[in-house]
Amino acid sequence: ADELTYRTKALLSKANNKAEMDKILAQMQFLGSISTAQAETILNSLKSIWELPDYNKWLSSYSIISERDISVNGQLYRPDKIFYNEEETIIVDFKTGKKSSTHKKQVRNYIETIAKMGFPNPSGCLLYLSDIPELEFFK
């Protein structure tokens, strides 16, 4: 994966809504870490992800925890996003590059940990960042 894909992943992990996303992108441009053209490329990638029906629903109607460390029995976990309401919890991890079985294993560890913490009905979702973003759901 290229540098812009990694920046897109970082932005997705941090921003919980469009206003935050725009603010972070503007800061990145102001600091000179990305050009205007790169900002547009990232913005287009983010829009294609935020327009996915499931992701859009989570953003607009679920509580969100972003990149928070969770420590259980000396193990440290840091899911990219946790979307939750009274009925369900979706743990989303953003991935660059090729699919790997270790990705599911990582998110299954998150699911187990979140369940122990009392979050309702946890499930996992891998979001692969590519030209066409792809969500992969599992329990």
Language model features: what each stretch is:
Residues 1-79, 83-86, 104, 127:
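Nuclease catalytic cores
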Residues 72-139:
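Nucleic-acid nuclease catalytic cores
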